[in-house]
């Protein structure tokens, strides 16, 4: 993953729990330094180690830490780093999600060898099925946080009704069934 991701995780922990907790997370992770270049690609294991250490230090399940991080990514990092692109991507949550792949296409030109996840939206009566397809595994809780963060951004309450894993050869394909109501 790119340094931007690791820097965002660092930022979240520092803002919500303080510098001392970040130093504990860093020590517990075994990651030798916390100076990540945003545009540089780092081994995914570094990010997973930091998330695991955050779980250990903060006394929260890894899934809860990843969900919190997904919300932070949308509300803090992406908003600051890509605010104008986010604003242009949609006026409501579903419109935004439908444009997410195009948004990733624009960002892809900035990062070498970047293979973003894909999102597809289907209406299901009053609910929506949001397909998340990625080469990476283990990030479904992060996506839940992304969805909840987008809900906050667009003034919409997001309720995850179900998560269904679709069998794929490599990576992850998860269908999130969500209900959206005005907040």
Identify the residue ranges that each predicted region occupies.
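Charged, compositionally biased N-terminal leader segments and the immediate start
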Residues: 1-33
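Short, mixed-charge aromatic SLiMs
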Residues: 32-38, 73-77, 169-175
